[in-house]
């Protein structure tokens, strides 16, 4: 009798220990992982990068907040197949990375690792007219600018959705920024919602109508036709 009682006393702690050990994984499995804030990279392939914070807010209507659930990127104008793409559809193609420095006419600059799709690939998907002269870009806040079709199709110009390996923040132009390399910052349109292929080579965007060069080349004058 004493031997059975001793066995019972010994087994009870063991049972509780097993129950306790078995319950921990279940409790842990029930917890969802906590999503932490994405951290930008500050160097890439040996090159130092600026921060996403090294920009000045100078948009015409303040920071825009685009709802990804309702966002559409329209590709229209002189195309055979007009497109209205969700964010997922827009980036569901070959993605590219490139370090490009944005230079503002205000005198500051920022060197960023951009990631996105080639504008040319989007134009090809829509069946653009190669005889067209101009591509007009429109932003969520109504801002517009234009660039020659030859510039966009002859160079690896990106429509970026990431900078320094993090999604572009609202204040930097989410969901898309045009990486208009070798052009002044006012050509780097943010919050892009529409890409229109046109024959209107005389089109002037917001800053161009206010005296800035329509060419926007870093090697050319800031002001002028």
What are these regions (language model features)?
Residues 71, 83, 115-118, 122, ...:
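Stable alpha-helical elements in mature extracytoplasmic
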Residues 93-147:
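Mid-length scaffold segments of soluble, non-membrane domains
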